[in-house]
């Protein structure tokens, strides 16, 4: 026969007391006990993408996957997140498995290359072990792994060129993510995995595209971003950048399937000012009449390029537009909860 209500409550309290004694206070809690603070985020560098993500940026303490075709802007998006984390006083690390990180380009995007921790590992096991140790230190704010496809298992590197190694990389990723996910949440570190596209053979219906490294990353990711180049930006006959579309194909912290478009300028990265102009027009703060852009009765310029230059020369106007957009849409970028003032998170036990 089922226990009476008072007996059940007493049994539960005894069990909770024993759990707290064995595993520490807070191991089990009622969901409504504490009002949870808003999710802390790291801005992406594009107001359009911050809005599409629904919370104002990439969530802290979560796994993020950025994938897309070659030269679509995946690493650029990741480096902008690194720059924004560093600007707020955070510590960043970059696992360069592709051995292709350009320090000069990273510096142009605002990354403090002197403070950036960089590793160029020899094997996938080494890369993920380094990443795991950095995360468990509790001192890291953002970690980028570029890319999953370049995380080659040790057995494949040491074997012959024609050897078959079925499922090795998928098993490696699955084991690593099982270990990392809890540590990421405890330390508040954002882990960005950059991934490449492959095509499945013999697919008759639906998209043949898939990402490397098995299915584990798809499951463990809180946010998945599909980055595509949709247009080449030209100044006369010279190509000066790309128009990029990012689709939020998975989002555990806000409604998914939203899209953002922004400009990536060669040698400069994401055009923050261009993104502000696009969102300002969309939200009604900037008026577009013909080719002229006007804000609050003041002409920004004729044509988007002139308006962009005006905002570059008058950053206060750009900041004001950004503030109004965020207030209207109810998003804000709480980055690192005042990293400089607060104590760093406690290291995670190995």
From Swiss-Prot:
SUPFAM superfamilies annotated for this entry?
P-loop containing nucleoside triphosphate hydrolases (SSF52540), RecA protein, C-terminal domain (SSF54752)
Q: Where is the signal peptide?
A: none
The alphabetical list of record keywords is: ATP-binding, Cytoplasm, DNA damage, DNA recombination, DNA repair, DNA-binding, Nucleotide-binding, SOS response
Which Pfam families does the protein's record reference? Answer: RecA (PF00154), RecA_C (PF21096)
Q: What InterPro entries does the annotation carry? A: AAA+_ATPase, DNA_recomb/repair_RecA, DNA_recomb/repair_RecA_CS, P-loop_NTPase, RecA-like_C, RecA-like_N, RecA_ATP-bd, RecA_C_sf
Locations listed in the record: Cytoplasm
A single GO molecular-function term is: ATP binding
GO CC annotations, alphabetized: cytosol
Tell me the residue numbers annotated for binding ATP: 68-75
Source organism superkingdom: Bacteria
Q: Which GO terms describe its biological process?
A: DNA recombination; DNA repair; SOS response
Q: Which HAMAP family does the entry link to? A: RecA
**Tell me, what does this protein do in biology?**
Can catalyze the hydrolysis of ATP in the presence of single-stranded DNA, the ATP-dependent uptake of single-stranded DNA by duplex DNA, and the ATP-dependent hybridization of homologous single-stranded DNAs. It interacts with LexA causing its activation and leading to its autocatalytic cleavage.
Q: Which family does it belong to?
A: Belongs to the RecA family.
**By what name is this protein known?**
Protein RecA
This protein's species is Mycolicibacterium gilvum (strain PYR-GCK) (Mycobacterium gilvum (strain PYR-GCK))
